[in-house]
A protein has these predicted regions:
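A transmembrane-helix-recognition feature enriched in membrane-embedded lipid enzymes
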Residues: 187-209
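General helical structural elements
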Residues: 7-9, 79, 162, 193, ...
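Residue-level signal for alpha-helical transmembrane segments in multi-pass membrane proteins
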Residues: 23-33, 57, 196-203
Length: 225
């Protein structure tokens, strides 16, 4: 009896080990697919000049009491550089403005204005609570069809995957202008986010908030609060 029980336990352990290995392989394959599916759409600022997108979409990140943190400031600088080069005359800044106390998008818009971009050319997406929400809302709220996304290179892989799978004609310009604190931790989190968003894109739920259309070819001050 004891011998049979041990044999059963051994067989179960082998099956669980095989299942775990298969799950790890599947997740690794999903991660690699998301990372590589649209990496050929990561382009240089010079290449962006040829595309005539509806807007330049700058994705949010941490803001401090004094304004954008280093990572977000570099995203903004890269997006503003593209704007001033004539890639597009519309900026869409998308981030978290879920509370009065924390507001990424007004900090982003103010920064862009301080760097010479007219207020009416800057649209704020106050409900860009995730990369998925930002892309979905760019398409459905701001009526964007073709877009240049500006964010860190490691974030562009997932951003471009989501955007293109949602039907946007999306390209990306990286904003890697310097080393950042906790870079390794952020990149590990990004691996998990790629896997999560693979399944989210497959289901395509609505974002946290939608709302009435605000066409990107209108006046950005319509998004002021």
């Amino acid at each position: 009896m004891e011998r049979a029980r041990r044999k059963t336990m051994k067989s179960l352990l082998i099956l669980l080990t095989i299942a775990a290995l298969l799950a790890i392989i599947a997740l690794a394959a999903i991660h690699a697919y998301v990372k590589n599916a649209y990496r050929n759409r990561i382009i240089t600022p010079d290449q962006a000049m040829e595309l005539n997108p509806d807007c330049i979409l700058i994705l949010g990140a941490r803001v401090w009491d004094t304004g954008p943190g280093p990572m977000l400031a570099d995203r903004l600088l890269q997006g503003i550089e593209l704007y001033k080069a004539g890639v597009s005359d519309r900026l869409l800044v998308s981030g978290d403005h879920g509370t009065k106390e924390y507001d990424e998008v007004n900090a982003m818009k103010n920064y862009a204005i301080e760097h010479g971009v007219p207020s009416e050319h800057i649209f704020m997406d106050h409900a860009g609570f995730s990369t998925y929400d930002s892309m979905y809302r760019a398409r459905d709220v701001f009526q964007v069809k073709k877009v240049i996304i500006v964010t860190k290179e490691f974030h562009l892989y997932r951003s471009l995957y989501i955007a293109n799978k949602l039907g946007l004609d999306a390209y990306g310009v990286a904003s890697d202008l310097r080393p950042y604190a906790r870079q390794e931790y952020v990149e590990i989190r990004e691996v998990l986010a790629r896997i999560k968003d693979f399944f989210k894109v497959a289901i395509q739920p609505e974002p946290t908030y939608l709302g009435d259309p605000i066409p990107i070819d209108g006046n950005g001050d319509a998004t002021n609060d």
